[in-house]
Amino acid sequence: MVAGTRCLLVLLLPQVLLGGAAGLIPELGRKKFAAASSRPLSRPSEDVLSEFELRLLSMFGLKQRPTPSKDVVVPPYMLDLYRRHSGQPGAPAPDHRLERAASRANTVRSFHHEEAVEELPEMSGKTARRFFFNLSSVPSDEFLTSAELQIFREQIQEALGNSSFQHRINIYEIIKPAAANLKFPVTRLLDTRLVNQNTSQWESFDVTPAVMRWTTQGHTNHGFVVEVAHLEENPGVSKRHVRISRSLHQDEHSWSQIRPLLVTFGHDGKGHPLHKREKRQAKHKQRKRLKSSCKRHPLYVDFSDVGWNDWIVAPPGYHAFYCHGECPFPLADHLNSTNHAIVQTLVNSVNSKIPKACCVPTELSAISMLYLDENEKVVLKNYQDMVVEGCGCR
């Protein structure tokens, strides 16, 4: 969608919301907008409402308005990722591996594994479990750049102060699952790491080759095998170290904080990759502007006012701004005009049939949004041309 169309959608938003759009905007959101308005607005036609809904949902890459349940939990990993890329104070320190992955992607998706975890037959000194992530919600036109499997490992009390307590975690792709005539599945090693048991932390494993085969090459997704190779005499200690399944008495909230997570980084071809948003400094002009001249004006979009805060996790709203004002003859330097606008304004001064130059955005920037999609999956996406940074006569 071109920048002009997006700006038009922002300006049309209050009118369309007050008019209805029942399939997109909840009744509560429409009532809030209606109560805030001091003058009645005419109801747009159903065709206009339908077109607006289609364009807005298309801009967000959605086919229908998400209606997530209240039990959906946003992984802390995704919240930290959003804070980092939106430039929020107190965000976690940059992770170089993560920064490289995000530098080529404009969409990050997270997936929890299916709760039913299959424990595979034990081999000497090893514990292995199979688990599965449903990736059917990844759009077919999204180009995958990388994928990571996040697994939490807990500190073992017996290992405190002893750095020799180690084990190896191996991650395999299942090529062919176990069957009646096949005791163990056929697997391919994806990543491996030697870890200490005396600390609690997340471990990230590169599973890009497997996820690319499943999502873009048409191979069947049989899941992963997580194998813990015990390097000590007591394998029972290490077995509790890697958290793949929920404990019997563990509550849902605490389990959601350490539950295994598959994270995909992709690009839909519709903008720039994720980046840390830097606050821009206002450009001060020496020349005094007329109050009515073309300039940027405040416009804050509050998602809670329109009932979108049930599926948009962050931000709660954003400063979109808009451009408005006169482009008088002669056009001053501070109006950021093109040569064509100068010529058009000159012709308008002698022939009123030719319209004046218009006050429009000349520079736009992106925002990062964290939201729940139609499948209740948590998505972090970079949306282009959402914030007006500069205005001019064009």
UniProtKB/Swiss-Prot annotation:
Residues with Phosphoserine modification: S86
Record keyword Hydrolase present: no
Coiled-coil ranges (or none): none
Propeptide: 20-280
Major localisation: secreted
Signal peptide: 1-19
This protein's name: Bone morphogenetic protein 2
Species: Mus musculus
